[in-house]
């Protein structure tokens, strides 16, 4: 479940030229907005092990006068399974609305007896990450694991050919890692929230980086302007762990990739 929490979200940096007269870049965004909520079932085969959600606050918060999205990602094991392995993971990013880059990041992990609390403040002007574990140099517009996911949703994924690799950078655990995302093609899948046309992508995993090379991760994103995650599949030695979309609300616009709704099946 920890890898699901990491991967669902693990994509992306693409440097765009700064508009004349502007201090920071501007990234067009039709994918998401205030108040969006995405809900998921996390399970193994036919067993539901937990729930997860992405939530954008309905109102902006501000960093140095710049409007920002206040975004949370949470994964929780079912209370009925807490005796076996209790999970309460929470991630937060403060994401610049105009530039789609992070100003702040929090990570609170509770998995069994393991606990970790980490926070970072990104000085995007001076390219530094000031964290609870020290201060580190970063490249321009570096991302955390949550902001990277939202940034990649703004990209025109339909313009990439099958097999193309999007190169990106992500700050994690005291370092900035180079990661790639391979475009695998298109597929139609059915989940609890309906039947969707999707673009399938694969984060390219490197040992010691954001993910461990324990298995393949595949992500299905809706093949429309919203590019919401419909499914995340992680292979493990004994099978596959899946996170599947069960519900959504507050979308920025229509979800044209949905072919059928749950009620029409």
Residue ranges and their predicted role:
Residues 8, 142, 151-152, 161, ...:
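Compositionally biased, intrinsically disordered low-complexity regions enriched in proline and serine
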Residues 21-124, 158-265:
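Acidic, serine/threonine-rich low-complexity disordered tracts
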Residues 114-156:
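Hydrophobic, well-structured mid-protein blocks that either form specific transmembrane helices
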Residues 6-16:
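Bacterial N-terminal signal peptides
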Residues 15-17, 137, 260:
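Selective for proline/serine-rich intrinsically disordered segments
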Residues 1-4:
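Positively charged n-region of N-terminal signal peptides that target proteins for export
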Residues 14-15, 75, 140-141:
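Alpha-helical interaction segments
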């Amino acid at each position: 479940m920890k890898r699901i929490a990491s991967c669902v979200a693990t994509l992306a940096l693409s440097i765009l030229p700064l508009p004349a007269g502007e201090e920071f870049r501007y990234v067009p965004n039709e994918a998401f907005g205030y108040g969006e909520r995405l809900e998921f079932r996390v399970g193994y085969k036919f067993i539901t092990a937990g729930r997860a959600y992405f939530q954008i606050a309905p109102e902006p918060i501000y960093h140095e006068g710049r409007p920002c999205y206040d975004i949370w990602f949470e994964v929780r094991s079912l209370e009925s399974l807490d005796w076996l392995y209790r999970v309460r993971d929470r991630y937060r990013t403060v994401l610049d609305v105009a530039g789609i880059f992070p100003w702040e990041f929090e990570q609170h992990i509770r998995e069994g007896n393991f606990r970790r609390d980490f926070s970072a403040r990104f000085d995007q002007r001076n390219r530094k990450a000031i964290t609870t574990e020290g201060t580190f140099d970063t490249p321009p517009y570096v991302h955390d694991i949550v902001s990277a996911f939202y940034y990649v949703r703004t990209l025109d994924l339909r313009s990439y050919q099958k097999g193309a690799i999007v190169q990106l950078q992500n700050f994690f655990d005291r370092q900035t890692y180079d990661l790639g995302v391979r475009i695998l093609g298109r597929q139609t899948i059915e989940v609890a929230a309906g039947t969707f046309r999707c673009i399938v992508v694969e984060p390219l995993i490197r040992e010691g980086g954001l993910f461990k090379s324990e298995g393949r991760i595949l992500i299905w994103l809706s093949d429309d302007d919203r590019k919401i995650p419909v499914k995340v599949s992680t292979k493990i030695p004994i099978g596959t762990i899946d996170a599947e979309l069960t519900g959504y609300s507050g979308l920025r616009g229509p979800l044209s990739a949905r072919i059928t709704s749950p009620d029409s099946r």
